[in-house]
């Protein structure tokens, strides 16, 4: 009896937790109220292709250091937001992706203590680039350290591989970083 009870409890918890994750074809309701899915830009769709966990190594141009990295993208908020949990050399950060008025807005919560906001500069089937949205970021190049741009390029020969590149402004100097991910 204990085994059956444990199994049923686990099934209920697992089923309830899976029910909270939205897919493209499911309507999301909270308390019987339908939630609108407002994330439909081409850039949001490009980020959705990355859902899951990607791991690899990053090379930092400033020091030449090579270190382990992981990036995990999850769909949340009824399918309207994607969160990216980043771990670079053991340091965790967070980036959010959501559409506002049909445009992808990216906000990065950085280990540098800054929160740059980005807009899409290019999106295609093979890559997506974002750059600092200076109108929405209260950051000054003379006074702050922050990520200035990011780019993801999918490997055409291997759908389970991509390259991630970013540029970071550190004490007025730009450093470029590159990670190969699987």
For each predicted feature, which ranges?
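Boundary at the C-terminal end of the N-terminal hydrophobic targeting segment
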Residues: 19-22, 27
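Residue-level recognition of beta-strand termini and adjacent short loop/turns
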Residues: 124, 156-160
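Central antiparallel beta-sheet cores of small beta-barrel/beta-sandwich binding domains
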Residues: 32, 37-40, 56-144
């Amino acid at each position: 009896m204990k085994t059956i009870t444990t199994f049923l409890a686990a099934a209920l918890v697992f089923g309830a937790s899976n029910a909270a994750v939205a897919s493209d074809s499911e309507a999301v309701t909270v308390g019987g109220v339908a939630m609108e899915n407002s994330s439909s830009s081409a850039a949001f769709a490009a980020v959705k292709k990355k859902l899951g966990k990607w791991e690899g190594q990053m090379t930092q141009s400033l020091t030449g250091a090579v270190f382990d990295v992981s990036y995990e993208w999850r769909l949340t908020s009824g399918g309207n937001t994607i969160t990216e949990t980043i771990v670079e050399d053991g340091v965790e950060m967070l980036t959010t992706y959501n559409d506002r008025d049909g445009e992808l807005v990216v906000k990065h919560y950085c280990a540098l203590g800054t929160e740059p906001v980005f807009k899409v500069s290019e999106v295609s089937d093979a890559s997506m680039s974002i750059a600092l949205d200076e109108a929405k970021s209260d950051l000054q190049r003379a006074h702050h350290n922050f990520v200035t741009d990011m780019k993801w390029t999918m490997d055409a020969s291997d759908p389970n591989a991509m390259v991630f590149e970013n540029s970071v402004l550190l004490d007025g100097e730009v450093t470029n970083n590159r990670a190969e991910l699987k």
